[in-house]
């Protein structure tokens, strides 16, 4: 089964770290990804930029398009990154989420991938 681990962070959290702290945190996440890859569980992982490059696109029934540029100050959490995993069970995905270094400063949301009609 394929699972996404979404790293949900408070907006602006990264800017509270010193440069050294940011490098240390990022290094721990890279090591975690490399270990998952070594175990044959990781398809891809990536951190996401937040802020001025964000955008939301909405297409309405009348084909009108609305594009809203970020940052989105009204949000309570931002997706700071993700891991796409192949796991035997949901329990395995949850165990991996508990191992994730980001669980110490963010929320890790575990979502199984599948068709949207199921």
Please state what every model-predicted region is.
Residues 1-118:
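Conserved, structured core segments of small domains
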